[in-house]
Amino acid sequence: MNTHNNNYQQRSMDSAIVTINDKGYIQSVDRKTCELFGYTIEELQLQKVNILVPSPYKEQHDTYMQSYFETGVRKIIDKSRVVEGLHKDGSVFPITLSVTEVRIWNKRMFIGSIESIIDKRLIIYTDVHGIITYCNRNVEELIGYTPAELFGKNVSALMPSPHAKSHSEYIEKNYHGGGLWKMLNRVRNLPIKHKSGVVFLVSILVTKISTDGIDMFKAIIQTPPKEAVFTINGDGIIKACNFNFTEPMFGYTQKDLLGNTIGLLIPEMSKIIDNTSLNLTDSHDPQLQQQQQTTTTTTTTTTTTSTTSTTTSTPTPASIAVSGNNISSPPIDSPLTTPSTPTTFNHSRGVESWLGRTRKVDVWHRDGSRFPVNLEIIKLQGENSMFSLQIKKVENPRVYGKDKDKNGGGGGTTENKDGKQLDTIKESKEHRHSKEKKKRKKDRDHNNNNNNNNNNNNNNNEQTSDSSDSSDSDSESRSKKKRSSKKKSRRDDSSSDSSDSETESSSSPHKKNRSSNSSSNSSHSNAPHESSYYQPEMIGEYTLGKTLGRGNYGVVKLGTHINTKEEIAIKILYKEQMTESEFTRCKREIEILKQLYHPFINKLLNVLEKDDAMFILMDYCQGGDLFHYVNKFGLKGVKMVNSPDIGDQVLMGVPLPEDDTKRIFTQICLGIAHCHKLNIAHRDIKHKNILFDNQMNVKIIDFGLSNWSYQEKMSFCGTPAYAAPEMLLGINYNGPEVDIWSLGVILYSLVTGKLPFINVTDMIVGKFILPPSIPLDLQDLIKKMLTVDREHRLNIMNVLNHPWLSKDPASSTLISQNLLHSPPVVHQPQPPQHQKIQPTSIIPNFNEVETLKNNILNNNNNNNNNNNNNNNNILNSNNNNNNNNNNNSNNNNIINNSNNNSNNNNNINNNINNNNNVNNNVNNNKNNNNNNNNNSNNNSNNGNNIPNSSNNTNSIINNNLYNQSLSPQNNNIYQHSPQHQQHQHQQQHSPQQQQHQQHQHHQQQQQQLQQQHHQQHHQQHQQHQQQHQQQHQQQHQQHQQHQQSHQQPPVYFPTQIISDDFNLTSQLQRTQPNQQVSFDTNQSYQQQLQQPQIPHQVLMQQPPQILSHSNNQPINNYYVGQQPIQQIQQLQQQQQLQQQQQQQQQQQQQQQQQQQQQQQQQQQQQQQQQQQQQQQQQQQQQQQQQQNDPNFQPHLRRIKMSKRDNSYNKRKSEDGDSYKKRDNQSYDDILKDEGNKRLRELQTYSEGDKSRQHYNRDSNDNSRDNNRYNNRDNNNNNNSNNNRERDRYKKNKNENFDYGKYKFGKSNEDEENKDKPNIVREKPDFKPSGSLKNDSSSNYGTISSGRNNNNGEEDEENKIKLKWHEPAEAKLPTEKWMLYPFKGKDQLDTIYLHRKKSFLFGRNRDIADIPIDHPSCSSQHAVIVFRIRKKENPNTGSIKTFILPYIIDLESTNGTFLKGEKIEPAKYFELRPKDKITFGTSTREYILLCEDSIEGDESEEEDSD
């Protein structure tokens, strides 16, 4: 029983989830539900849940729910049952359904857990002698054998006695002797024997198949279902039944039962059905036809002889037949044979008389056997009186027989010495039934010569009908013999069969002879198997061993290396059992495992793929999984979520010690932290997915449901028992927070031995109980991890930094070692950022801020060296938080403004190390205050080294950031947040920790003093502000005069100080070159520190302010010298007016430009219209000429001639127009044009003056011969070149040319077409193969044409299309084929590709390393590209250009061989004519032929062979 619960527990945790409201409408579904039923999420939302189930479950569900709302009786709530699901395509399949009620936001909702039942049917093929030739993989789970063990055995080895003894004789008598095939095409219930010796009942269907004249038998074996559902009307007529369960349970198909009465299966119900509505017909079953006739004649005679008997007795079920499909009911004698016969009933009520309670009745199988069931009838909703019948098999039939005998007054059970019940002798009613059954069998049998044979047949029929009782008795007798003998090893099948045959021989001597013959035959058939040797299955260099685990579409087996004996785990995924989405998930798991390399994540070794399966090779974890680790002593009383009797917490195992829990949980968190660092969320963390190696270290597996996180998703993944509330409710989530919830569930189970939640309602609301024995730190961690609000849920770094782990020395050491020495992370390349980087800087305290201002504005000769070396480092800052490279490069910065927390330690240390330089600069400034001219010179020199500020700074200043007050949440302006300090403390090495703490403590003290000083200064400043307002105006006038006399270089100055949780940033603005800055030399050094110099022409409404962290009051107002604010505002207004004037001028200029552009466009349009009119007139004239010319052929356009031809320019324009039209032409039209062009070439060459014409074979091809001939033309060798061209095309004048399915040129066999013009005609025998059968976009390749659109991107329309063809099989020796681009071939040689045997270089693939301006032809393992090579002639100095083919191996598994030698991957290898190429282990060879080597094809082919 525990095993059963355990299996159910694992199944229930891998189910799909559907959320339903109280009205039966679907609110949300998960991804697995969509895959299971074939719908999308949008199609299922707001639909009735009945869309997922067929009849009769569709009507039954509404009735159950309505009854629950009215009465509160939970028929299906909190219970699991096996029903049928309805796919979108109409197919029906079995599922397991569990419904749980939840309340969310005071609303009633229901959570449906749906699980697909795996097909566990055993399929066996045997020959005519019963020898097993094939069996599927379910044989190991059903009967314990492997396919290799059963191959070659006789099928009788799987049968217990007496079936094993009589099977061989039955085959000889019926098949070879021409007997009656009564056992074929019928579903029967028979016992079968497990490898361990246990006998149990199965449902079997045997059919005969013939393949190529060879007869074979196919047997489908499965365990009978335990539940069936019917829908009947008031007359007992079956209107609907479940599709998958009726045939294996009752032997009838759904088609046989629809329209017939329920009395066919339950004879007792025929009493409550109106007999007048039934018609008597014959049975369609050949076995029961004679039985129908016999019983009907018997009943008719009894009814005619005695009127009293017919009126007082109840009609027998044998007399009740079925109308529709001619099926008769099973035989039964009297009402005494049924267990719960009602004493009185009302005919008027009919089926309604059985409503309200569950009854135990007998159900008849089609083969004549019967078995007890529990029957429950409910009335469905609706106007028509329809009823639902739910039939459940009785688990222990003998207990039911015991109750039946007590109630019926006959029969019983006895007990042996061990206290176990044994079957006694049948009572008188059972004997009467068996005798009458034998009598009917004798009347049906025509061969009554031998009474012994008849007795044997009757005994066999008895054993068939009572197969369940015989199977139980055989199993108990066998177990009794094993206990008496006390042998550890199980007995052989032959010895058990012989012992059974001896016990049976005492009762029947005829059976003894028959069994001896069958046993000898079976032993003879098993002899070859015992001496045979089965070679183990191989995967690469590994042999497959035992099965480590199973899944929905694959298994995990142990693999052992042949030489090293190293053990690995091989995950085998069968493609035939996987859907497209599951196969995509498998590929995603492989891609994610390639990115992960961590000591606590199972490592991917290799991936192998075949046509029918995929093999994933991984490390073998010998320590088992976490589920078995916590379940060392076995599960007792296991209860799972959605189970029928739920009420307690789910028991997972024994609680682990705290030290062991910390070690395991820390390793799991470190592995998940590595995944989150790569933006990968696991989404299926559970006990089964956490393994242990031989040293008991954690290894995380099963990334099939993982995905790249940090993007909102609604898909439901993982196991419901570990799923977060947002997954159950269908709320968008990122991914990492879901993993934290699952980790919280695992942590709870490790310390308590139980799962935290009792039902789905508690999962959604986050209700769980923490035992008081758990430490307080651990309770706090579990509460924060199992928080329903995902925004307040901890992340993985907070979990690792929690006190429960950080206080433990072993855990903290493991965390620090893993984080400091974590494996390198390969970041994905980010796109280049074209925007300028805004300068920023980190300001740790206010002293350094003021010192920095003074260093910038008051540089002198003494600190020129320091500032020249560090000026860029001081002012060059970066606001890009994600740019790690800039953060690493600024380690030497005195003040580094960056929001990257991981680099703050180095910044603080750098600040500490550079304090001396700052102090020196301050002293130098103090000593040289009087040297104002030198300061200004230094500033002008240093200004060149300061980079220009980015546009981002200007935009921020223009938005008047000084009006924005700092956030009230950022109370600590100059102090880092505690989280940030703790993060710094963890990342520093042990020597730096004490230094950092001292610096932090000193920094806090300084900040407190500075804040007090700033508050006092701010109050004093407000008092004196009004008094000095007039002085500011005067000083402002003086300042303007001083500005005109002295121009200062542009400088940086702080405009705003922003505080956040981690650092203090200072945004700097650079003044424009035309702006001036004045310096008040009369001010003291302290005044200059308190009042930094700011340019007057700054677009700000008020000076920058620093707000106090306590009352948000300004600490210090920054302004220039004694200048008042009003004057600054006047300057701002003046500048605004100037800007408005400039904008008006710019608008006027833009309007003028637009008017000019419009005029130009109008002129261009007029010119285009005129050109179009001229072209139309020319076309009309040409059409008139063509109509007058009878010999004109529009499809034969002459090609371009030499430049010496008088019509060269005219033909060039014609060619240009024709290429423009090609974009809109179809592929067939282009083929016709190319073929016609080749014909016109030959005609043009034969006509006219040969001495004046220089023929170019194709205007777009630039072959090696053309390159060679053009070079000879440059060397005054035009005559020889022309002679060669003439000779070649004289020879090929009458030759045919093939392009795909079109053929060009004249045919010598067609005499009728000799005088007709050469036109394009389609080849009749053209048969495209491979990918060319479907002319889709995948058959085309593209190369760049070098043309860009207005946006600077490559135009899709200008891309050059390539297509690959396969030659006709009849033209193999001399057929010439080439990779033919349609345009852009000016730099390409003509390369012909010749098919040597059966195919040409496979399919094309997109490869980034191939030059985009050259076409390529690729195979499964290698690619051929064309590269440009230049060579200088030492005699003439001219440079020749060659286009040569090269081959590149793509790092394939099997490699590529060139001329018999394997080439190195990722390198270019030059190809030459007649080179032979072999790809991988393929036996096909390929030859690359150029134009010079085509003519001698036939002789060269013989030499190559």
From Swiss-Prot:
Residues 1399-1463 form the FHA domain. One of its GO terms (molecular function) is protein serine/threonine kinase activity. It comes from Dictyostelium discoideum (Social amoeba). Residues 2-72, 108-178, 215-284 form the PAS domain. Residues 398-407, 415-430, 1202-1271, 1283-1301, 1313-1326 have a biased composition (Basic and acidic residues). The keyword Transmembrane helix does not apply. Residues 431-443, 479-489 have a biased composition (Basic residues). This is Probable serine/threonine-protein kinase DDB_G0280133. SUPFAM superfamilies: Protein kinase-like (PK-like), PYP-like sensor domain (PAS domain), SMAD/FHA domain. The keyword Cytoplasm does not apply. Keywords: ATP-binding, Coiled coil, Kinase, Nucleotide-binding, Repeat, Serine/threonine-protein kinase, Transferase. Residues 542-805 form the Protein kinase domain. Its EC number is 2.7.11.1. GO terms for cellular component: cytoplasm. ATP binds at residues 548-556, 571. GO terms for biological process: intracellular signal transduction; regulation of DNA-templated transcription. PROSITE patterns: FHA_DOMAIN (PS50006), PAS (PS50112), PROTEIN_KINASE_ATP (PS00107), PROTEIN_KINASE_DOM (PS50011), PROTEIN_KINASE_ST (PS00108). Residues 282-348, 398-533, 855-1048, 1072-1091, 1181-1358 are annotated as: Disordered. NCBIfam families: sensory_box. Residues 289-314, 328-344, 448-468, 515-532, 855-960, 975-1013, 1022-1048, 1272-1282 have a biased composition (Low complexity).
